[in-house]
């Protein structure tokens, strides 16, 4: 009886805490859009600042644990990013992303560990654990800023693609290294590489199996909310399955998200369902980020950080320098061989943004919190990671916008938005006018009033059309945007038709080669 009562009280308390966190987060979201001075601060960074203010006055919300971050918060965030990462963009930038997510992690781990050991006096094995945690990037606020300011698609893909795969690699490196200070394992290069490949391979395999299985399953029915629910199940399912099989859950989620976003959504979902699922995941990402960044700020204990201030300063300097070496050095290699294996050439301006925008966040914190209690220096590692995360979020995160503007990397996003709104308005007015011209459907309406409405809508349509012409004359590149949207629409119609035929049982073969061919033809067409 007492156990049941205690469990009931625990559930009630946790629910109250959750509602408090949610209320604070949504209040900040509202203020960030209504108070002019707050509009200049990225939403996620504002959450961290408010969380720190709560921690300063000793208001503790929910305690962050590695399980809460890695198993509850991280899968939906990874899936949403992977769902929206287009394969064609990833294919164009695969080589630099691969370099950043593999060799880049190695450079960061080595480049952070040795300064912490040499100048900070940490045991080298412990320093490597802190370095592994800090090698995981989490540029959520920077990517949101890219989208808001209209940075290039290439910059978005490089930053987000690196982050997705980098997180998985960093977590695997940490898991391999954590046994060394505990004395349960020793470092052997061949064994370590074999384990690394195995863990990554299991994650990729789980993601592929779940992704393609669900893609084929959703071809057989058209139930938007069921398909939406299946994507949620796939995100957590891929993580749990990969982890239970000894693989990387992070890599599993990334792979299943990419498969469903680029393949499953094309062959198994109609445009309406794709829109519903995309909006759902946009909401989930906003919801989770709202909670996690507030909690990150709330977990930062300034008094504890001051105890390890020298280590934090060394780590900050090492993170900034190793990120610089990693981005500029690997970009140089990528650019040298871009003509042979990759079409991407990363400019110095883009390299600068990639360097400065390599923030640390929730993944680094989750890894640090998962350091075993048996390691005496556990609190020092946690303080180092929290200190670096705080610096990257508040200093680099708040100044990235000025770096983008200073390097003239702000795109034509305002014009694109205006163009999209005008086109949408034009389509809507044309449909309204077409309905008004069906006079027999309005027998009870006075003909004069009907004619007046037709003339009014016709005038509005002409005004919108004129604005579109002027906008295209002033910004000719918008025509290229229109052409790409048209190509995508044609591809969607083709995919939807094949999916309908499969559901009817009239087609059973894999349609992906047909879609790739069609996409290639569209790309090759003259604009």
Swiss-Prot record:
Keyword Transmembrane: yes
Membrane disposition: Multi-pass membrane protein
GO CC list: plasma membrane
GO MF annotations in UniProt: potassium:proton antiporter activity; sodium:proton antiporter activity
Transmembrane segments: 18-38, 41-61, 94-114, 126-146, 169-189, 196-216, 240-260, 276-296, 311-331, 352-372, 380-400
Cellular localization per UniProt: Cell membrane
UniProt record, GO biological process: potassium ion transmembrane transport; regulation of intracellular pH; sodium ion import across plasma membrane
Function: Na(+)/H(+) antiporter that extrudes sodium in exchange for external protons. Might be able to function at relatively high concentrations of Na(+) ions. Also has Li(+)/H(+) antiport activity under K(+)-rich conditions, but it might not have any physiological relevance.
NCBIfam families, sorted: a_cpa1 (TIGR00831)
Annotated family: Belongs to the monovalent cation:proton antiporter 1 (CPA1) transporter (TC 2.A.36) family.
Name used for this protein in its record: Low-affinity Na(+)/H(+) antiporter NhaS1
Classification of source organism: Bacteria, Bacillati, Cyanobacteriota, Cyanophyceae, Synechococcales
